[in-house]
Amino acid sequence: MRNPLMQPWLTEKSTGLTEQKGQYVFKVKSAANKTEIKAAVEAKFGVDVASVRTVNCLGKTKRQFTRKGVLAGKKNDWKKAFITLKEGQAIDYYSGSTDQGEEKKSNKG
């Protein structure tokens, strides 16, 4: 798998984990495993990863009531990874995403 990291998961809860325990949360591809996630984080941000925990999140079921009846659907399932770094290290989300954005722009131009 090329790059299992999709985006950082920035919520109040994940920000609290970052400040208190030094854990970072990422939305990752569903097929990614812990070793691939660890290698991707270490390569992209240049940090040492102590541990990786993953959670499979189920997509919500949605219903829409119309004149023709009830239309049922489901959002996609996804995976969330909790990354714990070694003591004294930190990730700057914005520097990592800026580098990737510049690469995308240069490929188009």
Swiss-Prot record:
It comes from the Bacteria. One of its GO terms (biological process) is translation. One of its GO terms (cellular component) is ribonucleoprotein complex. It holds the Pfam family Ribosomal_L23. Keywords: Ribonucleoprotein, Ribosomal protein, RNA-binding, rRNA-binding. Disulfide bonds: none annotated. The keyword rRNA-binding applies. GO terms for molecular function: rRNA binding; structural constituent of ribosome. Part of the 50S ribosomal subunit. Contacts protein L29, and trigger factor when it is bound to the ribosome. One of the early assembly proteins it binds 23S rRNA. One of the proteins that surrounds the polypeptide exit tunnel on the outside of the ribosome. Forms the main docking site for trigger factor binding to the ribosome. Belongs to the universal ribosomal protein uL23 family. This is Large ribosomal subunit protein uL23. It comes from Prosthecochloris aestuarii (strain DSM 271 / SK 413).
